[in-house]
Swiss-Prot record:
One of its GO terms (biological process) is nitrogen fixation. Coiled coil: none annotated. InterPro entries: NifW. Homotrimer; associates with NifD. This is Nitrogenase-stabilizing/protective protein NifW. May protect the nitrogenase Fe-Mo protein from oxidative damage. It comes from Enterobacter agglomerans. Belongs to the NifW family.
Amino acid sequence: MDWFTRIEGVDELESAQSFFDFFELEVDPVLLRSRHLHIMAQFNQRLTAAVPVHFVDEEESDRADWRLARRLLAESYQHTVAGPLNTQSGLAVYQRNNGSFIGWNDLLEVRP
């Protein structure tokens, strides 16, 4: 992910909105406010998995990195807002597979 941190200006971004402004992406501010953690977690996963292609021309390589990061951020936003959070979010709280139920009587038995 070193390629991402080398993009000029990225180290100054402090909020989800600042990322979208930096990469010149239009988003619904209400959705961004309510789902920013999920979007940015998805973006981080995509950044970690991405392997950019570097060109001999350093200026073109920098622009390609910016375009790749922009595309990954846009994909993260689209994926997260496309449906309900419990199916679209990659956060662990939504990935619990084993539900459990403890009956009221069982709870009363433990009581001193």
